[in-house]
């Protein structure tokens, strides 16, 4: 499915914030309880460490911290927000929605709030939904949160999944931006035939009496790799075509941070070099719906992404699902100095 642009108001990201828990889990930490090594993990995934939430820290808590980071950068960032969307595969509970819990903690009680579940594709889906709500007149601005506590969902003794995932959150306000900036095109898709290749059946519930039952994350790594390379490359090319762009027009690719081999192979497929690709999987692992905002925020803060540059966001996830979008970046979203960032995350 594609969403056409045509002649319409410019909508984009007006504020951005992120959060990762302070607990660092290195590859060496896994060596104590499973047959693996730092060299084996790095060579196959590109991951060196990831962050795990504390026992009393839930998905909504991470999301709230990401919004607080956003507000530290832009104290007026939540002005006119009418709807909150949380993209997550690890909600605090089946209901109330994690979005509603976050809204209540950041001064947005009364705003519309709902969760969106397309696993690692969730942030792209949520950005598209946010734009639609604004263009349709339902909202003036939308707060989009991608937050995950995947460390609780995986079997920490399963080498095929435990080494891959980390916890984190990103928050973005979507709203009107200057003409010539913002979102250009979206491509969204899903194919349930591949669902058995990557799934999670149930999870811990933060409410009293919550328990973990049945299987956790299941994955056919070989099938997921083939799917991911194909769909990232194809959806990336499709959204470029819809935008009237070529790979040469792209200043930065921000891919879902799942596996460095997948990122490299997908880039080769649509012709963008790794030198134009934002990668931080080595420090955070696969944070699912949080991976895109974490990578985007980092590249804005360190000066790689500049006003007016052409961005390509691509993601895939369970479902199996995929999403891609083209964005002309607006630098009105404030960034923090290193000292300010340290104060926010302390």
Swiss-Prot record:
Gene Ontology annotations for the cellular component aspect, listed alphabetically: cytoplasm
EC number: 2.3.1.180
Subcellular localization: Cytoplasm
Region (ACP-binding): 257-261
Catalytic activity reported: malonyl-[ACP] + acetyl-CoA + H(+) = 3-oxobutanoyl-[ACP] + CO2 + CoA
Single annotated GO MF: beta-ketoacyl-acyl-carrier-protein synthase III activity
Entry superkingdom: Bacteria
Keywords of this entry: Acyltransferase, Cytoplasm, Fatty acid biosynthesis, Fatty acid metabolism, Lipid biosynthesis, Lipid metabolism, Multifunctional enzyme, Transferase
Annotated PANTHER family: 3-OXOACYL-[ACYL-CARRIER-PROTEIN] SYNTHASE 3 (PTHR34069), BETA-KETOACYL-[ACYL-CARRIER-PROTEIN] SYNTHASE III (PTHR34069:SF2)
Subunit structure: Homodimer.
Entry comment, domain topic: The last Arg residue of the ACP-binding site is essential for the weak association between ACP/AcpP and FabH.
Record-given protein name: Beta-ketoacyl-[acyl-carrier-protein] synthase III
Organism: Deinococcus geothermalis (strain DSM 11300 / CIP 105573 / AG-3a)
């Amino acid at each position: 499915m594609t969403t056409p642009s045509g002649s319409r108001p410019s909508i984009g990201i007006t504020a951005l914030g992120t959060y990762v828990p302070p607990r660092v889990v290195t590859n060496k930490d896994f060596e104590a309880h499973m047959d693996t090594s730092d060299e084996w993990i790095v060579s196959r995934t590109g991951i060196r460490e990831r962050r795990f939430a504390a026992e009393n820290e839930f998905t909504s808590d991470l999301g709230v911290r990401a919004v607080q980071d956003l507000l530290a950068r832009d104290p007026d960032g939540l002005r006119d927000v009418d709807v909150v969307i949380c993209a997550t595969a690890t909600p605090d509970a089946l209901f109330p929605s994690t979005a509603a819990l976050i809204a209540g903690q950041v001064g947005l009680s009364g705003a519309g709030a709902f969760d969106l579940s397309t696993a690692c594709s969730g942030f792209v889906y949520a950005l598209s939904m946010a734009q639609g709500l604004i263009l349709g007149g339902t909202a003036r601005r939308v707060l989009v949160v991608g937050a995950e506590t995947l460390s609780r969902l995986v079997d920490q003794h399963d080498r095929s999944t435990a080494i891959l995932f980390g916890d984190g959150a990103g928050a973005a306000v979507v709203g009107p931006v200057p003409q010539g900036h913002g979102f250009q095109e979206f491509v969204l898709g899903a194919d349930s035939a591949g669902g058995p290749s990557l799934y999670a059946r149930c999870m811990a519930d933060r409410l009293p009496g919550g328990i973990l039952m049945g299987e956790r994350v299941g994955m056919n790594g070989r099938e997921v790799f083939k799917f991911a390379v194909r769909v990232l490359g194809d959806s990336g090319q499709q959204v470029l075509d819809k935008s009237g762009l070529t790979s040469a027009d792209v200043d930065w690719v921000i891919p879902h941070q799942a596996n460095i081999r997948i990122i490299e192979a997908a880039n080769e497929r649509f012709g963008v070099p790794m030198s134009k690709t934002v990668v931080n999987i080595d420090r955070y692992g696969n944070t699912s719906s949080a991976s895109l905002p974490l990578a985007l925020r980092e590249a804005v803060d360190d000066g790689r992404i500049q006003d007016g540059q052409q961005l390509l966001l691509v993601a895939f996830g369970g479902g199996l699902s995929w999403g891609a979008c083209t964005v002309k970046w607006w630098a009105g979203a404030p960034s923090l100095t290193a000292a300010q960032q340290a104060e926010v995350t302390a």
